[in-house]
Amino acid sequence: MQKAIIIGATSGIGQEVARILVQQGWHIGIAGRREEALHALQATAPDRIITEQLDVTEETATLHLHNLIKKLGGIDLFFLSSGVGHQNRDLQPDIELNTARTNVEGFTRMVTAAFNYFKEKGSGHIAVISSIAGTKGLGVAPAYSATKRFQNTYIEALAQLARMQHLDIHFTDCLLYTSPS
């Protein structure tokens, strides 16, 4: 039986990935800030979905992650789909800093916890949702672009570290783009 944790499963891509994995027979742990959305998704497959409310910007997020891993009895896949992005033409500092808190601090907190879990386990797969904005930058969303660049580079560096340490940890950075018709 394959097991995964999806952080950011309360909406969008994370929610859809959760649905797809359950359809494919996976047992999953889902996490996010909105408890009602977590329970609504859990109700679709209560025998295969467990939940844990967490906010990646809080220091306790890794404790919640480890609790979810324990409830599942271990995991094979860690999928991070938690993030924020806003247009900020006026460069309001609170918007920029909140984006950095979620997309850099929260991202780092969760991905390093997953990396260390898989290092101890001996194998695993870390998948993250990044953005094409991390390759070129978007003038209307400077913090979003910069944080996505950070994520791209961080995952590349972790993949190198895993190879250097001869770890069986695999990485997927899902850049969002529209393929040609």
Predicted regions and their residues:
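Rossmann-fold cofactor-recognition segment
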Residues: 45-60
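Residue(s) in the substrate-gating loop at a strand-loop-helix junction
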Residues: 131
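Conserved small/polar residues in nucleotide/adenosyl-binding loops
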Residues: 177-181
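Conserved NAD(P)H cofactor-binding loop of Rossmann-fold oxidoreductase domains
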Residues: 81-86
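Short alpha-helical oligomerization interface
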Residues: 89-101
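Conserved glycine-rich cofactor-binding loop
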Residues: 10-11
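Active-site helix of classical SDR
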Residues: 111, 147
